[in-house]
C-alpha cells in the first residue's frame, strides 16, 4: 500500500476556496428561485446532471438518483434504470406558480371527467414507442447497442419535432428501461397490461396493443387493477368500453385489497392504516378470472391444472385462517423460485422463439409506474414476494417468478409512453415521484376543480375571518389551509409550509383516499344503465364475498387504501418522513355527507 502524502492546512484552505468558487459560479442565474425548496432541488440537479451530448436529450431530468461510488462488484449501476423525463424550464415553473396563486378554481362538469383514448394518444401519429431495430447474429454487441441508440435518438427527435414541450406529457427518455420492455415482450407467451381503474386510458397505449397483437401475434390481457377504488358501475363501463374498441383484448378485473362496496365506510377510520396480516394476499380478487383468460388463450397447449389447484388451496387457506382466528405467517407457503435477470439475459434471443417452451407459459407483466404490477404478482402468488412502493420507478429490472411449475410470471419496470395528457393528471396518477415535483400546486388545483377537496377536508380559507362566509379559492389557498390544519411549518420562520402541504394532498390522491375517477365517453348520460347492469350486481356480490374478513388490523397512522400499499416498506421520498406519526383528521360522528365514497369527510373538531 503506498504511503499517504501529507496534506497541509494551507492546501486544505485552498481546496475549500476553490470549491466555494465553483459552487458560486454554478449558482449564477438561479437566484429567482433561491428561497424555495423546489428551487434548491432544481439547483442541485443542474449541478449534477450532465447531458449526453444529444440535442433531443439536452434538457433531461434524471429522477430517483442513488448514491454510487462507481460500478458494484458485479458491474451493477444503481442509476442505470432511473426515470428520465424532460425538464421543465424555470420560466414555466414560475409561470405555473403564479397561476396557482392567482387563478380562482371553478368546479368542472361531469362531462369533463370523460376521457377518450383517441384524444390522449392519437393513434397513427408519432406518439408511438421505440421498437428494437432489425439485427442479425453477425452483429457484435457494440454494433447492436450503437444501432439501438441511433434508432432511439431518431424516435425522440420525431416526437419532439412534431409536438412542443407544452403539449407533450412526461415520458421515458431512458433507453435502458425500454430495453427491459423489449426483452419482456420477446420472452413472453402472454402479455398482461396492467392499468389503474381510476384512469385506465392513461395507462393503455394503443401502439403497444397494435404491436403485441399484430406484429408479435401474442395475446394481450388487459388487467383493470385497483377496482376497490372505483364504483362497480364505473368498472363495468370501462370493461365494456375496451371490449368495444379493442375486440382482441381479454379484460380481467383485479384488486389485491378487495372490500365490500355495500358496507358503509366508518368515517372514524378512513384515514387510518389497515395493515394486512397473515394470509391477506390470498384474498385478491381476480386470479380466477386471469386463469380462465389464460386457459382460453392456450387452448390446452399448457397444463394449467396446477394453477387451478393453487388458487383452490389459497382460498381454502384464507378461509381456514379467518375462521380459526390464528395469524399465519406469509413465509409458510411453498417456496417461489425467483430469477433475477442480469445483462446476459438482455442479449437478443432471435427474431422468433418457441412458444410455450418445455410446457411452461411465460406471462409478462407490463404497464405504467404505480399501477400495481408488483402487488398483482403478490396477489397471484398468495403472499409477498415482490417489494412494493408508492414511489414510481421502484422496480428496477425485470424478474421472473414461477407461480407453478408450468406458469412463469415476468415483472417489467414501469414505463411511461408518450401522450398528450396534462402533466397535472400524470402527477395525480402517480406516474411522477411526488417528492421530486418542482411545482406541485397546479396539480392540486387540477384535483380541487374536479372533486370538492375543500369540503371533504373541512378546510378554512386562510383569509376568512367569518367561517360561514364564501371566499374564492385558488390552489395556493388550499395548500396553505391544509398546512395550517395539519401544522406543517417551515423550519426557520415557522410559516405555513405550502410545499409540504401540496405534497401531502397529492399523496392522498395517489393512494386513493381522495379518489379522482375518470369516466368513459357517454358515461354521464348512461350512468343509470350501468348501475343497474347485471355485471355490476355480480361484481358487487363478488367483492363482498372476498372482502375483508377480520384479517386486518387498524393502526393509528395514515392508511394506504390502494392496491399499491406498502407492506413493511418505508417510502423513500424525503418529504414523506414523519407524516405517519401525526394525527389523522376524522369525520364528525353522524356526518350527513359520509357515504360509500372511498374517502370520507374529515371532522372539524377531531383534527
Swiss-Prot record:
Residues carrying Phosphoserine: 32-34, 51, 68, 324, 561-563
An annotated Gene Ontology molecular function: GTP binding
Note on domains (UniProt): In contrast to other GTP-binding proteins, this family is characterized by a circular permutation of the GTPase motifs described by a G4-G1-G3 pattern.
Residue numbers bearing the Phosphothreonine modification: 48, 50
UniProt binding sites for GTP: 225-228, 367-374, 411-415
Known function: Possible regulatory or functional link with the histocompatibility cluster.
Origin superkingdom: Eukaryota
Bias (Basic residues) ranges: 1-14
Organism: Pan troglodytes (Chimpanzee)
Stated family: Belongs to the TRAFAC class YlqF/YawG GTPase family.
Segments crossing the lipid bilayer: none
Gene3D superfamilies linked: P-loop containing nucleotide triphosphate hydrolases
Pfam families assigned: MMR_HSR1
Gene (UniProt): GNL1
Keyword tags: GTP-binding, Nucleotide-binding, Phosphoprotein
Ranges for domain CP-type G: 178-418
InterPro entries hit by this protein: G_CP_dom, GNL1-like, GTP-bd, P-loop_NTPase
Biased composition (Acidic residues): 550-584
The protein's name: Guanine nucleotide-binding protein-like 1
Compositionally biased tracts (Basic and acidic residues): 15-26
SUPFAM superfamilies cross-referenced by the UniProt entry: P-loop containing nucleoside triphosphate hydrolases
Region of interest (Disordered), residue spans: 1-81, 547-607
